[in-house]
Amino acid sequence: MRRALDDRRRGPHGPEGKPPMRVLLTCIAHNTHYYNLVPVAWALRAAGHEVRVAAQPALTDTITASGLTAVPVGGNESVLEFVTEIGGDPGPYQRGMDFAETCGEPLSYEHALGQQTAMSALCFAPFNCDSTIDDMVALARSWRPDLVLWEPFTYAGPIAAHACGAAHARLLWGPDVILNARAQFRRLAAGQPEERREDPVAEWLGWTLERHGLTAERETVEELIGGQWTLDPTAESLRLPAAGRVVPFRFVPYNGRSVLPDWLLRKPGRPRVCFTLGVSARETYGRDAVPFHELLAGLGDLDAEIVATLDPGQLSGAGEVPRNVRAVDFVPMDALLPTCSAVVHHGGAGTCFTATLNGLPQIVVAALWDAPLKGAQLAEAGAGVSIAPEKLDAATLRAGVVRALEDEDMRRSAGLLRAEMLAEPTPAGLVPQLERLTALHRNGRSRSAPER
């Protein structure tokens, strides 16, 4: 009895009996962006902390399907609706945000300024509309979280954290292109005459803070843009240099609710290649960036099983697929890729990270956001092949797949990246660091709520 009482007095965090943290996670209304938050959210929950996820209503079902508590904020705006408004064509704004270029050769101030303008007007402001930010600030002031974790597009998160005094950190789902581009822009701006200096992102944040009776010094604005620290699951050698504290952790895949098909439980009789253009790309843009039926025909004579993720609409327009192609609407990547020898994909975060975690050579056909950069990084590391969409044809893809299956050096390089990811702490191992950093950065206002 005495031992039981002693254990109870210790509480969830050892002899000090510290109360659990309140942790608020937030994400734009896009499934794959949210999926990358789930393992960290559950690690915190399993450690005894209170966890809630705030997002626009379009994401509510996805959040609750992951077993976490959803708090709808804002209207029903979503990434899909925004893309529909611009005509379903990512080209106009993608050309202003070429991160493969940003992270390579030095840029002009004009290019960097244009990039910051495009990001604030076409990404940050639409994804963080006034109603979403208003509801987030009200939630933070009411619930008083100790820590706010936010994915890199969701600036409603740090704004809400600033409003209630919570600590806050970004949780990345890919290379830190936003903060890398920001650092380049600030260096270039510092060399300009005062009258030429503009900062669209800081201006937008400043207006938003003023609406809620908040002010912030320049240093605080930069902290809101980049987080008080950054959680980064990228393999160490692929990690971009960025200002501020970076806390690495191991990527753990989460693909939503799924059921394994019987065929996936059996060992393949020949090399298996995953061919996926990504569910998120199909859902977001309503079309494919590459002529998949021609590409599959070009792989038809390989002594390999090609598992292609195609929805019913794609299948109906593809005609008869080659005999070595297994066409499926959806299969969880965390279950499929461990059985594969190579993967062809669009550069999406979940697929790319899961492939890297499994040590697979990757053929990346990428056009959007940071995907061209990821393809270039993998090619430079010797762990993959990068193909620009405009240069893609059946012969080029076939050559890339053959190389991925036969090149032992590529397989070894992919294995090195896998080892880098496995060397980092799991989300469960990350929790003590989050507890320490939260105590360090929380300014006290988050503790001013009534007794729980």
Swiss-Prot record:
Its EC number is 2.4.1.316. Keywords: Antibiotic biosynthesis, Glycosyltransferase, Transferase. Residues 1-20 are annotated as: Disordered. GO terms for molecular function: hexosyltransferase activity; UDP-glycosyltransferase activity. It holds the Pfam family EryCIII-like_C. It catalyses: tylactone + dTDP-alpha-D-mycaminose = 5-O-beta-D-mycaminosyltylactone + dTDP + H(+). Belongs to the glycosyltransferase 28 family. Involved in the biosynthesis of the macrolide antibiotic tylosin derived from the polyketide lactone tylactone. Catalyzes the transfer of alpha-D-mycaminosyl from dTDP-alpha-D-mycaminose to the 5-hydroxyl group of tylactone to yield 5-O-mycaminosytylactone. It can also accept 16-membered tylactone and 12-membered ring macrolide. This is Tylactone mycaminosyltransferase. It comes from Streptomyces fradiae (Streptomyces roseoflavus).
